[in-house]
Amino acid sequence: MKAFAENLKALIGETSISEFARKVDIPQQTISRYLLCQREITLSNLCKIADYFDEDIDFLIGRKD
C-alpha cells in the first residue's frame, strides 16, 4: 500500500488533490486517505487512476518499475 501511495503522489505532482479527484471521479477524501495509507484502494478506483495516467496497474502498486 505504501508503494501505491508514493507512486500516486509522484504522478499527481503539482496538481491539487481536489482537482485530481474531480478528474478521476473519486472523492477527494478517498484520494487523501490513499496518500496517507489509511485506506486500501478498490479495483475500480485503481483502474480509473491507471487509465487517467496511462500507467500499468503493476507499476502503480509497486510490482514493477
Segments from the language model and where they lie:
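A short, Lys/Arg-rich alpha-helix, primarily the initiator
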Residues: M1-E19, K23
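Short, charged recognition helix plus adjacent turn
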Residues: A3, E14, D51, I61-D65
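Conserved hydrophobic/aromatic packing and binding residues within compact polymer-binding modules
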Residues: L8, F20-A21, I31-Y34, L60
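Short, flexible active-site loop motifs that bind/organize anionic cofactors or intermediates
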Residues: A10, A21, L36-R39, A50
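Short, Lys/Arg-enriched C-terminal cap helix and immediately downstream tail that follows
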Residues: L11, L43-S44
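Short coil turns linking two alpha-helices in DNA-binding domains
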Residues: S16, P27-T30, T42, D56
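Recognition helix of helix-turn-helix/homeodomain-like DNA-binding domains
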Residues: D25-E40, R63
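DNA major-groove recognition helix of helix-turn-helix/homeodomain DNA-binding modules
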Residues: S44-F59
